[in-house]
Every structure is written in structure tokens, then in C-alpha cells.
Amino acid sequence: MWKINRINEMKQITSSNELRQIQMDILSYVDGVCRKYDIKYSISGGTLIGAVRHKGFIPWDDDIDIMLARSEYDRLVEVMTNEYNNGNRRYRIITHNLDNDYLFPYAKVFDEKTLLIEHVRGCKNFGVFVDVFPIDNVEDQSMAKTFPKMRVLYNMLTMKRLIWEKQRPLYKNLAIILSRLILLPFSNHWIISRMEQLAKKCSDSKTDKMACLVWGYGRREVVPTYIHSEHIYLPFENREYMAIKEYGVYLSTLFGDYMKLPPKDKQVTHHDFEAYWKD
């Protein structure tokens, strides 16, 4: 992890266009690796809405997400790690198993020439990134137990990152401190490992539903398995990236009428960070 004691010597990335260009370069590298190794991925979430509705970024969005079936996800982590270790030192994929400072149950691909400081406790300073989410098999009979368990683990992970804040009511701060004391025996990595184990419970089963279990929108993530079987390329800004062919089923399940713009007060970014060039 990059030390930030030289931050005053770094050039800050203040332009949203510059930030987006870096993110697209990361995605283009991932796309190239996926083409090389015949790995199927799809842009997802707001990135997919952007491609369909705007032919690029949602105007107020500031990140890029992709998703892969668990088997493809594992392959991507493996081949990108090998590419990095074999000399491509610009782009690095990280999971909690690859870096002890990384505390999420999904992967990110970072640009090693950048530094990104997120103003959230527990988020270490890596670089500008693209989020990479695994999609897992889901069985109807297990969903009633899986989602509540995953929610508990997610809340545990979130609670361990909260700190005392002056603007927060005293009783809430005290409740957070008490909760964090109760959670002391459970490390972040233990929680993430439990989330992964729970998500991969049906990996060896053929199911008719899939979902991003480790993060996201809970039951709204559940979609028919068949929509992950065919992929196409969609225009995004001045490039093309892979997407599931049945993106309409996926997007309407998650977001309803995804072609309708949200109210003006909802058209805001949800991330708080600063980005820099290291050199």
C-alpha cells in the first residue's frame, strides 16, 4: 500500500473527465485480459445503465462496476495476478486474500500510478479503481436463510468501520462504540471469509437463479441464470465493453424503469474521495 507522506508532492486529479479516463483505461485493460483468456464479464449496476441510457457514464456517476459468474471471477483474479507478477505492473487486481489491507468481499482493479484516498474508516489508500463483483448461484430453498445471514455479516463489517463523529447524536455514538467492542473477537477478514463461504455455498449446484450475494441490493439482485449465458458489446463513451445480452431483465429487476431519470435531488455522486498521480 502506498504511503501518503509525499502527498503534497503529488498532482491531484480534480477533473471528472480525467478521472473517468483513468477508470476507462483500467476497464479497457480488464477487457483485453478477458478477451485474451476468453473470460466473460459484464459491465453492471450504474455503469450498465449509463451504457444503455447515455452511451457512457451517467452524468453524475464517478465509478465503474463489472460482474462475472463466480467461476469466471476466480479465473480473472488468477490470470490478472499472474499478468501483474509477470511484468505488467500498471494494473493490479486485489482481493482480501491478496492484500491484508484490503477489506471488501469483492475485487478491485487499481491503477498503480494513482493514489485514491477514500474518506471512510477502514478504506485503505490504494488507487483509482474498477469494482469487480462475483455472481453466485442461488437456490430457492436457501434464499430465506442466506440473505438474512449475509445482511448480518454486512452490518458487522460496516459497524467495525464506524467511528465517533461529533455531528452524530451521543446515544448513537455510544451504541456504535458498544457494538464495536462486542465485535472485537471478529476480524474483518473473518467476516469477509464467512461472506464468501456463504455466497459460494451453491457453487457446485445447477440453479435457475443467480445473484451478487456479497454486496449490493439483497434480494433485488436475484435474476434468472440464463441472462448470464450470452454477452454482447455495448458502446460506452468512445469504446465498447462486454455486457449481458439480456441487460433489460437485470436492470429492471434492480432498478425498475431504468430509462427514467431520477429526481434532480437524487442526481448526485455517492462517493467521497481524493485522487492523485503518484509521479
Regions found by a protein language model. Name each.
Residues 151-166:
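Short, cationic low-complexity segments
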Residues 77:
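Helical (often loop-to-helix) elements that flank the catalytic cores of nucleotide-handling enzymes
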Residues 57, 72, 156, 274-279:
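Short amphipathic alpha-helical patches
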Residues 31-64, 68-74, 226, 253-254:
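Active-site nucleotide-donor binding segment shared across nucleotidyl transfer reactions
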Residues 2-7, 11-35, 80-140, 160-164, ...:
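Conserved catalytic core of two-metal-ion nucleotidyltransferases
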Residues 141-148:
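A short secondary-structure junction signal
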